[in-house]
Amino acid sequence: MGTETATLGGGCFWCTEAAMEELAGVTDVTSGYAGGDTADPSYRDVCSGTTGHAEVVQVEYDTAELAYEDVLEVFFTVHDPTTVDREGPDVGSQYRSIVLPHDDQQHERATAFVDELAAADAFDGSIVTEIEPLETFYPAAEKHQNYFEKNPDAAYCTVNVAPKVSKVREQFGARTE
């Protein structure tokens, strides 16, 4: 079958990256920026809130082991898609909930997935996740890649990232590495 790539933003990319790396079938996760207008932004640029970009991850996965919907299921489990421009302690448009489909099929599948969650009243509030076609993905600097793996004892990681990783292990145990 091959590999596919999903691009998702659900708050700080360190959290989303670490959660996605737990899934068996994920072959690579890259933190970066997308959804804005500034070419080749830096972390500082994106944190200023003026670029229009969100912190996102690109998740490459083996389609023999995972479906796009599996990736979406984990994504919607590890962040709150009902808060506008916020995830946990992180506030600003760069932390918005966003799915950036790579093609029309992913767009249809993401829209259907969100519609199913909404119909099932899966969350206490309305889902505010944006679904916008991916135009350009800009990888973040190397120091942001595999951040949790490199800094597991950093305060932000112990308070914010580790609980999301634990949640993936608990809820998706059979599908984790």
Swiss-Prot record:
GO BP terms, alphabetized: protein modification process
Superkingdom, natural source: Archaea
Active site per the UniProt annotation: 12
Keyword Signal carried by entry: no
GO molecular function: L-methionine:thioredoxin-disulfide S-oxidoreductase activity; peptide-methionine (S)-S-oxide reductase activity
Catalytic reactions of this protein: L-methionyl-[protein] + [thioredoxin]-disulfide + H2O = L-methionyl-(S)-S-oxide-[protein] + [thioredoxin]-dithiol; [thioredoxin]-disulfide + L-methionine + H2O = L-methionine (S)-S-oxide + [thioredoxin]-dithiol
Entry's EC annotation: 1.8.4.11
Alphabetical UniProt keywords: Oxidoreductase
Summary of the function given for this chain in its UniProt record: Has an important function as a repair enzyme for proteins that have been inactivated by oxidation. Catalyzes the reversible oxidation-reduction of methionine sulfoxide in proteins to methionine.
Family: Belongs to the MsrA Met sulfoxide reductase family.
Full protein name: Peptide methionine sulfoxide reductase MsrA
Protein's organism: Halobacterium salinarum (strain ATCC 700922 / JCM 11081 / NRC-1)
Lineage: Archaea, Methanobacteriati, Methanobacteriota, Stenosarchaea group, Halobacteria
